[in-house]
Curated annotation (Swiss-Prot):
This is Glutamate--tRNA ligase. The keyword RNA-binding does not apply. Its main location: cytoplasm. The gene is gltX. The keyword Cytoplasm applies. It is found in: Cytoplasm. Pfam families: tRNA-synt_1c, tRNA-synt_1c_C, tRNA-synt_1c_C2. GO terms for molecular function: ATP binding; glutamate-tRNA ligase activity. One of its GO terms (biological process) is glutamyl-tRNA aminoacylation. It catalyses: tRNA(Glu) + L-glutamate + ATP = L-glutamyl-tRNA(Glu) + AMP + diphosphate. A motif ('HIGH' region) lies at residues 106-116. Catalyzes the attachment of glutamate to tRNA(Glu) in a two-step reaction: glutamate is first activated by ATP to form Glu-AMP and then transferred to the acceptor end of tRNA(Glu). Belongs to the class-I aminoacyl-tRNA synthetase family. Glutamate--tRNA ligase type 2 subfamily.
């Protein structure tokens, strides 16, 4: 083997070792070589042997020696590493004093989707970066309007685990009502809150005129008595609320004396976990403010639609003499072409569509479709903390996913709309087909004999000459594929299309489900090579010249159903 080829192998062996803590990998090195010099694939066996030899040598060096070799012989590879580091997307630095504590507070009234997963990923990532704590807090204190779904607690936890998110503490707000009552008593006793007995319409009219409710000046003692009557069920729903005293001259009416707690008729609207145990429930802003303080949250990352909520909650913090957490708010994140509204997704799910329907932008739907968790995280980190709304096209999502799958997914042969042909070859041929182009040493063998029936796509059959991948070159003649030659060089000279094929007597029936958010799910029937039979449910592979698919179901009769991810 020439010196320039040995130098090429040595260069990539050094670079791979230096970027992986001093240990190079033969397969990774060979993959880089074939990517740069594809013509060397014909000498794969020799290349692999040289790679093994030089990788062993490089791995015997310490990291500092590897770096010196790169600096002296291949300095451009160090520059490449520097560029890779600079191009890696990271979250911006934030001010931290002491132990950083973040939280993710989903309402378990539906599944997570790409948009609301953003707060979870960013909050967890900052906790990881700064060696802090991450809290999962279920915001489930509205059993009427945003009623929690019992299954949603587990849906959310399953999605977070899939994303690689681990929480240090799990909290359910509905289990903390006594805590909220105690803080309400403090606010009432200090005159910062009051019990409003006005009708809602009457209060709204007064608020619009910036006029005080007649109950605003009720004594703390009387308010505390009324509050005890509220929590003991002596007031019907809509008859009494606890309001925080703010500024009636504030320009935003919603911030004027907003509601801390209200009566909810849990006989009609029982909580899925607490049932009808509690009669008085905190609003989102009251429960969030109390929990963020009580649980020691120092940093909050959330959508900019919560900006008004922050202003409301600061009133409580100021009254109590607490320091408000550091807050960063970001814009909405949408997946183009998909319904992103939680309420709309919930409506669809309630009609019997599973949360993992591959047409939905739910994390469960994307997962079932073959989108990797690392892809979701990379997209979120790349968008970062931008305050402007962002829309991600599915093509962009697929592009990121493809780069990751390309490195790991097996390449297998599937034929849609198959057409039968008898192969006319002079003698048996043993095809050795690599599972992945980066590793020619791992392959499956398919033995083809003269007269075997071969299945190819009906559109491919329209060409006069073809190359059956890793088998031979053929001429299409009626219902026969007539042997032309064996080598790939002949195919290149004649510009032959290189196609996938399946041997009929070893074929596996395959159903491809191709989801479209608007058109529904298209079903494509075809056949696959025998290796598809050995795939596990949930495994993602690439069907050659077709796209990436994820195994969804394996039937007792041998049929394999897959979901099309993307090209």
């Amino acid at each position: 083997m020439s010196d320039d080829i040995r130098n090429l192998v040595y260069k990539y062996a050094l670079h791979n070792a230096y970027t992986h803590n001093g240990k190079a990998n033969v397969n990774a090195v060979v993959s880089k070589i074939f990517a740069e010099r594809p013509e060397l694939r014909s000498k794969a066996k020799d290349i692999v042997e040289i790679a093994k030899e030089l990788v062993n040598y490089v791995n015997s060096l310490d990291v500092e020696s590897q770096k010196k070799e790169l600096e002296s012989k291949f300095p451009e590879m160090l520059e490449e590493k520097k560029r890779e580091k600079e191009s890696k997307k990271e979250l911006p630095d934030i001010p931290v004093s002491g132990v950083l504590v973040t939280r993710f507070a989903p309402n378990p009234d539906g599944p997570l989707h790409l948009g609301n997963a953003r707060a979870a990923i960013i909050s967890h990532e900052y906790a990881r970066i700064y060696n802090g704590k991450f809290i999962l807090r279920f915001d489930d204190t509205d059993p009427k309007t945003k009623k929690p779904i019992p299954e949603a607690y587990d849906w959310i936890k399953e999605d977070l685990k899939w994303l690689g998110i681990k929480w240090d503490l799990e909290v359910r707000a509905s289990a903390r009502l006594e805590t909220y009552y105690n803080f309400a008593r403090i606010l009432l006793s200090k005159g910062y809150a009051y019990i409003d007995l006005c009708k809602e319409a009457e209060f709204k009219e007064r608020r619009s005129k910036r006029e005080a409710c007649p109950h605003r000046e009720t004594s703390p003692e009387s308010n505390l008595e009324l509050f005890e009557k509220m929590i003991h069920g002596e007031f019907e729903e809509g008859k009494a609320v606890v309001r925080l005293k703010t500024d009636l001259k504030l320009p935003d009416p919603s911030q004027r004396d907003w509601v801390l707690l209200r009566v909810i008729n849990v006989k009609k609207s029982p909580h899925p976990i607490e049932g009808d145990k509690y009669w008085v429930w905190p609003t989102y802003n009251f429960a969030s403010a109390i929990d963020d303080y009580d649980l020691g949250v120092t940093h909050i990352f959330r959508g900019k639609e919560h900006a008004v909520n922050a202003e409301k909650q600061k009133w409580i913090y100021n009254y109590m003499g607490w320091k408000y957490p550091y807050v960063r708010e970001f814009g909405r994140l949408k997946l183009e072409g998909f319904m992103m509204s939680k309420s709309k997704i919930r409506t669809v799910v309630e009609k019997g569509v599973g949360i993992d329907d591959p047409r939905l932008p739910t994390l469960a739907g994307l997962r079932r479709r073959g989108i990797l968790s690392d892809t979701i995280k990379e997209i979120i980190i790349t968008v970062g903390l931008k305050e402007t709304d962002a829309t991600i096209s599915f093509d962009n999502l697929a592009s990121t996913n493809r780069k990751k799958l390309d490195k790991i997914a097996k390449r297998l042969m599937f034929v849609g709309s198959p057409k039968e042909f008898i192969i006319d070859i002079p003698q048996p041929i043993l095809a050795k087909i690599p599972y992945h182009p980066s590793n020619p040493n791992e392959y499956r063998e398919i033995s083809v004999n003269p007269g075997d029936i071969i299945l190819i796509n009906e559109n491919d059959a329209k060409d006069k000459v073809l190359r059956l991948m890793e088998l031979c070159n053929v001429t299409v003649n009626g219902d026969k594929l007539v042997y032309n030659s064996k080598g790939i060089e002949d195919a290149k000279k004649l510009g032959m299309k290189i196609i996938q094929w399946v041997k009929k007597d070893e074929s596996v029936p395959v159903v491809v489900l191709s989801p479209d958010p608007e058109k529904g799910i298209e079903t494509i029937n075809g056949v696959g090579e025998s290796e598809i039979r050995n795939l596990n449910k949930g495994e993602i592979v690439q069907f050659i010249r077709y796209g990436f698919v994820k195994v969804d179901e394996k039937s007792a009769d041998g049929q394999v159903t897959v979901i099309f991810s993307h090209e």
